[in-house]
């Protein structure tokens, strides 16, 4: 409270710009985007879930076109210390730091944090065909299943359920 009443107040928009939806709102403001706006928070699955939710919004006719994506920027001291406390970070390879990241190697020792972002523009097939767009892919199914297992150790049954829901939504069988 001392700092609060010291006269060093925060900027008026600090809370609004720090909220979970701030990036989504800023992108919409910058580009005049209207329609469904959603900020998805599902750890490593956030961007995949956002794409699935966008596909559903298009399917249900809530929009003709949707910008969807994900980003992560955890490389700040507090985040690194927190991940280190979990004891899941890879041991640094002092001779060849790029070798520290080897996710499919038998000698892997943990994960290496990174930063990144990507965005896609998804649209209804009818909209794309009307404008003569080259169609690169079709999203035909989405499934999302929490497994109520553990924060960092998913239950394979939950992963299987998500795949089953995706196949069911797409009208496909596992062997297709």
What are these regions (language model features)?
Residues 1-53, 86-112:
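Conserved catalytic cysteine-centered active-site region
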Residues 1-5, 171-176:
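Short, intrinsically disordered, charge-balanced linker/junction segments flanking boundaries
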Residues 32, 59-60, 168-171:
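Residue-level signal for alpha-helix termini/capping positions
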Residues 33, 43-46, 56, 71-74, ...:
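Short acidic/polar capping segments at secondary-structure boundaries
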Residues 38-42, 63-71, 134-142, 175-176:
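Beta-strand segments within the central parallel beta-sheet cores of soluble alpha/beta enzyme folds
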Residues 48-50, 74-78, 148-149:
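Short, well-ordered, mixed-charge alpha-helical segments that flank or form enzyme active sites
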Residues 96-174:
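Condensing-enzyme catalytic core mediating Claisen C-C bond formation in acyl metabolism
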């Amino acid at each position: 409270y001392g700092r609060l009443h010291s006269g060093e107040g925060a900027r008026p928009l600090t809370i609004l710009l720090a909220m979970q939806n701030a990036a989504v709102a800023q992108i919409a403001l910058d580009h005049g985007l209207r329609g469904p706006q959603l900020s998805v928070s599902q750890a490593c699955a956030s961007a995949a879930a956002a794409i699935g939710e966008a596909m559903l919004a298009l399917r249900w006719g809530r929009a003709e076109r949707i910008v969807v994506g994900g980003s992560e920027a955890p490389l700040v001291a507090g985040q690194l210390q927190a991940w280190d406390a979990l004891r899941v970070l890879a041991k640094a390879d002092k001779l060849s730091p790029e070798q520290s990241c080897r996710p499919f190697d038998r000698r892997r020792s943990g994960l290496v944090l990174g930063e990144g972002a990507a965005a896609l523009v998804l649209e209804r097939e009818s909209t794309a065909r009307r404008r003569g767009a080259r169609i690169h892919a079709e999203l035909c199914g989405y499934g999302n299943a929490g497994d109520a297992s553990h924060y960092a150790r998913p239950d394979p049954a939950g992963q299987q359920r998500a795949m089953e829901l995706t196949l069911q939504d797409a009208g496909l069988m596992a062997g297709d």
